Amino acid sequence: MKAIQFDASKPLDLIPLGRATIDLNPIDYYKPLDECVTFKRYLGGSPANIAVGLARLGKKVGFIGKVSNDQFGKYIIDYFANEGVDVSHVTRCQGGQRLALTFTEILNENESSIMMYRDAIADLMLSVEDIDEAYIQSAKALLISGTSLCASPSREAALKAVALARKNGVPVVFDIDYREYRWQSADEIALYYHAVAEQADIILGSREEYDLTMALLAPGLDDAGTAAYWHGHKAKIVVIKHGKQGSPPIPATASITASSLSR
């Protein structure tokens, strides 16, 4: 089994890169959004929640991201700081971009959906100038969210961060984290997802996300073939999620299958 080496001398356990947003969830359960009146605000964005979750577990966590230069941007920075997440590389937009918003519609116990507002948003304004090599060097691992790859200049910033992590021996975690917003084509998704996945030590995604990632260069593979394909690159751990159906065993010693969890 290929082992992942984490440098214990590094001060930060993980630096996620990607979106920090606002989620607005209705308190009026089991109604369509047009009938909901009261909403509760939450921190949104997979990389942001990973950062906070690890900080609550006692880990030293940083973050690389862009937020709006307004009260909601202040909310994100203050929230991170209060949770113990290092905010030295969370910067503010100067062009009037706003935080992305996500509304959750909960129709019943088994049916829900989300509505995302992701036009002219702050997190996709992260630029190559925001990527600090010394900061990446300070981490045991770097996590890249796939949503950061959907548009420029965030796309180039993420690619620079991956390149610097590999240069400095920092393991790369790729959370495919697909959202349909802002992508221009299936080929574009496959091109940029594959470019990061082939540099990653750990890859996390659903079956559908792997299919998107591999559509150009290795389409049609099952779970075992998918794991073998990425083990043929740099990946030491491949996680293929199947939601509440769980995941079948993958015959690859360095792979992990994520079964559904009872709540």
Regions from the PLM with identified roles:
Residues 2-86, 259, 263:
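Glycine-rich phosphate/adenosyl-contacting loop at the front of the ribokinase-like
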Residues 60-144:
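Conserved N-terminal subdomain of the carbohydrate kinase-like
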Residues 1-14, 163-167, 215-263:
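Conserved phosphate-binding/catalytic region of the ribokinase-like
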Residues 134-135, 195-196, 231:
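Structural alpha-helical scaffold elements that stabilize or flank donor/cofactor-binding regions
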